[in-house]
From Swiss-Prot:
Zn(2+) binds at H641, C643, E665, C726. This is 5-methyltetrahydropteroyltriglutamate--homocysteine methyltransferase. L-homocysteine binds at I431, G432, S433, E484, D599. L-methionine binds at I431, G432, S433, E484, D599. Belongs to the vitamin-B12 independent methionine synthase family. It catalyses: 5-methyltetrahydropteroyltri-L-glutamate + L-homocysteine = tetrahydropteroyltri-L-glutamate + L-methionine. The keyword Metal-binding applies. Keywords: Amino-acid biosynthesis, Metal-binding, Methionine biosynthesis, Methyltransferase, Repeat, Transferase, Zinc. Pathway: Amino-acid biosynthesis; L-methionine biosynthesis via de novo pathway; L-methionine from L-homocysteine (MetE route): step 1/1. Binds 1 zinc ion per subunit. The gene is metE. It comes from Paraburkholderia phytofirmans (strain DSM 17436 / LMG 22146 / PsJN).
Length: 764
């Protein structure tokens, strides 16, 4: 009989309870005990959902107070030495300082978890890293679950993935040299699990789905030769891509089973079936853990029948990956179109899908009604008139190659823009958003509840825009933004104004820490019925004589940060988005806006995990960006913004986007990203972020000037812009004004220094 489990479950809570408890703790409004209590309640609730779905295992260890990689660093005793914290006595307050920074130290670096929109904190390792052990929250959670008589399956990120995703803080240090010590620590952790009577442990190794060098693969084999004989059965979990080429290697290791992502990489199944020994468990990840569409249970059931006949009780049915990447439950969705809602499955519903498949394998008659209901929903979706728009189909068919090209090359555009815009050396600007104050959030909530008239809401937003404009003028910024007071989210705001999009009331997923996003759903062809930002941007420009920058979200990011329809290629949906954004760019230019930013923070996130698959993605991703941007005159300056990214391996494609200015996240990595831009001789203008907006720490003007001087060593000052790392939506006004004051001072001081050619430095 097939068994059931999931790799992980969302931790934030159906009503974002963890987020609100975290932020209350950070503000000093509640203590650690309150936060611990909320976390305990959430874990128990999520375990009970798995029990209620009749899963054979309850997953424990997927919870984190901020991030699972940070949790693992704390458990291993591998905290950044620069903080001086003792991992064994780590408090939640200090745990959060690692994630958010403090007065003495900036936060740990944060970057994307593989090709998802989740962010993890990058471990900082070096020769002095000992893995002596740390705070054992994991075992507290296991004990909680055991006390509830639950069938516990702990989950940990595996040692190879942990090292692969870490960074060395010592130049030239080979972090793989730490593996022997790390394996010893993992072995001790597994021994503690054995002492608690744990039968199975899930060790996540998604790094096996990227292009690992051979020395890392050999290290993987050596590690699991040890860990597989710990006395606890190891389920080696891979996800997000195929790991088929490693099947022969894994087959000779003493691991008791493997988990495969058969949604993203169904083609790998045959290799694993051929390689796995007769005793090994195959965990089939057949329910999509990264998208919200109801599964075709009938088709999946048919495919599982042959596997079940072959593997019997060694077949486990599961989701493709952790359900962290989808909302918790459809129960709270009262306003979704009924037909659309019937096409969806969130995390809780996916538990039911996993259980239904196992039931169908055991007793087809018992699952017949549920399978039939799924078939009816899928059939209704296939034939719905809301999915296809003839106008969009006609326009997509008419797209030409010329639509992706600006009128002139960058050098000519740059000359014309310098004449038209009249900006100083090292122009200062921000990335777009300003603090979303309680007053802004309350007004938006009241408007959405129908308690505030549209005209009153418009007046309040215009008042906030004027505040943002006046503050920027006082700060001395060169290029202003309207502050995005009216925008709840950089994707949702636009999606709400496009056909083919739908929105949930409570479809939150965790992006990082307490930051949650509510991705819209692209269910049909995308079309812009009317301008989206023109009136707001025109109003903001009317308040000032300075340049006002229009702010849009790019087609790739709209795609990546939405739940995307799965009935046509993603590239087709991206092209539809590009055409909608192109129309908005043209309308902004007609309204007198001479600088327009098309944000693409998720551009790199869309890269396939395997380098061999990159070229096809980069071709269509750069094309749709260019189509979105190329409808304007040469004198109109197009900016783009990217954050949390490593660009060096895709710089030709970044250059091919042909944005006049790119702003990037660099402050946490001490401008190291710029080295690649310099070596590549990136031709266009660039704004390296000079301070980290994710930390409440305000760097002084001297520190920012040093970063700018470092940037000038790589990029000519004539092509540099000065800006923060990212938008300022999540920050408060006092720290925002303090940081921007220092940023402007740093830019002015460096301008003067470059003009005078003397080494005077600003004072803090």
């Amino acid at each position: 009989m097939a068994r059931t489990h999931i790799p992980g479950f969302p931790r934030i809570g159906a009503q974002r309870e963890l987020k609100f408890a975290q932020e209350s703790f950070w503000r000093g409004e509640s203590d650690e005990q309150y936060l611990l209590g909320v976390a305990r309640e959430l874990r128990a609730r999520h375990w009970q959902l798995q029990q209620d779905a009749k899963l054979d295992f309850v997953t424990v260890g997927d919870f984190a107070y901020y991030d699972q990689m940070l949790n693992l660093s704390a458990l291993l005793g591998a905290l950044p030495q620069r903080f001086g914290f003792d991992a064994k006595t780590l408090s939640l307050a200090r745990y959060y300082e690692l994630a958010r920074g403090n007065a003495a130290q900036p936060a740990m670096e944060m970057t994307k978890w593989f090709d998802t929109n989740y962010h993890y904190l990058v471990p900082e390792l070096g020769p002095q890293t000992t893995f002596d052990g740390g705070v054992e929250w994991l075992f507290d959670e296991i004990d909680e679950a055991l006390a509830l008589n639950l069938p516990v399956k702990p989950v940990l990120i595996g040692p190879i993935t942990y090292l692969w995703l870490s960074k060395s803080h010592v130049a030239g240090f080979d972090r793989l040299s730490l593996l022997p010590k790390l394996v010893i620590r993992y072995s001790r952790l597994l021994e503690k699990l054995k002492q608690r009577g744990i039968e199975w442990v899930q060790l996540d190794e998604p790094a096996l789905c990227v292009d690992l060098p051979v020395e890392w693969l050999d290290a993987f084999s050596a590690a699991y030769d040890v860990l597989g004989t710990s006395g606890v059965k190891v389920l080696l979990a891979t996800y997000f891509e195929s790991a088929a080429e490693h099947a022969p290697r894994v087959a000779v290791l003493p691991v008791a089973g493997v988990h495969l992502d058969l949604v993203r990489a169904p083609q790998q199944l045959d290799a694993w079936r051929a390689a796995l020994p007769k005793h090994a468990v195959l965990s089939a990840g057949v329910i999509d853990g990264r998208n919200i569409w109801r599964a075709d249970l009938g088709e999946i059931f048919e495919s599982l029948q042959a596997l079940h006949a072959e593997f019997g009780e060694r077949l486990w049915v599961s989701s493709s990956c952790s359900l962290l990447h989808v909302p918790v439950s459809l129960d709270a969705e009262q306003k979704l179109d009924a037909d659309l809602k019937s096409w969806l499955a969130f995390a809780t519903e996916k538990l039911g899908e996993v259980a239904t498949l196992a039931l169908a394998l055991r007793d087809p008659a018992a699952a017949e009604a549920t399978l039939a209901a799924a078939d009816r929903a899928l059939d209704a979706r296939r034939h719905s008139s809301t999915v296809v728009n003839a106008l969009v189909q006609k326009r997509v068919a008419a797209v030409s190659s010329a639509m992706a090209d600006r009128q002139s090359p960058f050098a000519e555009r740059n000359r014309l823009q310098r004449e038209a815009l009249g900006l100083p050396l090292l122009p200062t600007t921000t990335i777009g958003s300003f603090p979303q104050t309680p007053a802004i959030r309350q007004a938006r909530a009241a408007y959405k509840r129908g308690e505030l008239r549209a005209l009153d809401y418009l007046q309040r937003m215009r008042a906030e825009i004027e505040i943002a404009v006046r503050k920027q003028e006082e700060l001395g910024l060169d290029v202003l933004v309207h502050g995005e007071a009216e925008r709840n989210d950089m994707v949702e705001y636009f999606g709400e104004q496009l056909w083919g999009y739908a929105f949930t009331e409570n479809g939150w997923v965790q992006s990082y820490g307490s930051r949650c996003v509510k991705p819209p759903i692209i269910y049909g062809d995308v079309y812009r019925p009317e301008p989206m930002t023109v009136e707001t941007t025109r109003y903001a420009q009317s308040l000032t004589q300075r340049l006002m920058k229009g702010m849009l979200t790019g087609p790739v990011t709209m795609l990546q940060w939405s739940f995307v329809r799965d009935d046509q290629p993603r590239s087709t949906t991206a092209l539809q988005l590009a055409l909608a954004i192109r129309d908005e760019v043209v309308d902004l230019e007609k309204a007198g806006i001479r600088i327009i930013q098309i944000d693409e923070p998720a551009f790199r996130e869309g890269l396939p995990l395997r380098r061999g698959d990159w070229a096809a993605y980069l071709e269509w991703a750069t094309r749709v960006f260019r189509i979105s941007a190329a409808g304007v005159a040469d004198q109109t300056q197009i900016h783009t913004h990217m954050c949390y990214s490593e660009f060096n391996d895709i710089l030709p494609s970044i250059a091919a986007m042909d944005a006049d200015v790119i702003t990037i996240e660099t402050s946490r990595s001490a401008m190291e990203l710029l080295d690649g831009f310099g070596a590549f001789a990136y031709p266009n203008e660039i704004g390296p972020g000079v301070y980290d907006i994710h930390s409440p720490r305000v760097p002084d003007a001297q520190a920012m000037q040093r970063l700018l001087e470092r940037a000038c060593e790589v990029i000519p000052a004539e092509r540099l812009w000065v800006n923060p790392d990212c938008g300022l939506k999540t920050r408060g006004w006092p720290e925002t004004e303090a940081a921007l004051t220092n940023m402007v001072r740093a830019a002015k001081a460096l301008r003067a220094k470059l003009a005078a050619k003397q080494p005077d430095e600003v004072t803090a």
